[in-house]
């Protein structure tokens, strides 16, 4: 019967420290617990003394950019994370761009790419040839029996990552 409350400070933690911990918690929720950034975050953790240190720095970056005050789209979260990566690991930002691309397409067949991503690297002609061949041979998309090449193209995605062409299949996946 007691009203819900939130601790704002204790005799051990100041208000500012509690807020800082809440910000770090939000970064862990968004970038780790969501499961949307698995590849990127696993690699990015190696750039810091500890995972906590990384999330603390990311929270400080959000605070510096006043990003906690705004609700962000999923694509917006990718853009903020990429900006953070450029600031902290500029010399490896290309590698992280590919990891972010992989994370993004593992989750969803994104139609609008974040601004920092270049084109997929797979030309229209290459994609058309792949789906035309796949329509006849069903080498990679056996579960798409009964679908024509246009339907398969809408239900999958081709992306060039690290010099290799990767096929993302969205028919059978975890949500």
At which residue positions do the language-model features occur?
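Flexible glycine/proline-rich, aromatic-decorated loop/lid segments
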Residues: 1-2
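Polar, glycine-rich mid-to-C-terminal structural blocks
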Residues: 7, 15-18
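A cross-taxonomic marker for long C-terminal extensions/tails that follow the last structured domain
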Residues: 17, 25-26
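Conserved, mostly hydrophobic/aromatic
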Residues: 21
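Radical SAM enzyme core and accessory elements
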Residues: 26-175
């Amino acid at each position: 019967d007691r009203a819900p409350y939130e601790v704002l400070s204790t005799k051990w933690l100041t208000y500012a420290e509690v807020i800082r911990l809440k910000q770090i918690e939000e970064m862990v929720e968004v970038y780790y617990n969501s499961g949307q950034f698995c590849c990127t975050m696993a690699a990015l953790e190696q750039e810091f003394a500890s995972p906590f240190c990384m999330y603390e720095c990311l929270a400080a970056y959000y605070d510096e950019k006043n990003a906690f005050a705004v609700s962000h789209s999923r694509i917006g979260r990718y853009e903020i994370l990429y900006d953070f990566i450029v600031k902290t690991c500029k010399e490896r930002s290309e590698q992280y761009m590919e990891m972010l691309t992989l994370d993004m397409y593992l989750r969803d067949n994104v139609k609008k790419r974040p601004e920092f991503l270049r084109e997929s690297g797979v030309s229209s002609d290459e994609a058309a040839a792949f789906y035309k061949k796949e329509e006849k041979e069903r080498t990679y998309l056996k579960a798409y029996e009964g679908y024509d090449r246009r339907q398969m193209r809408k239900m999958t995605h081709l992306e060039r990552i690290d010099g290799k062409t990767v096929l993302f299949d969205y028919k059978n996946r975890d949500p």
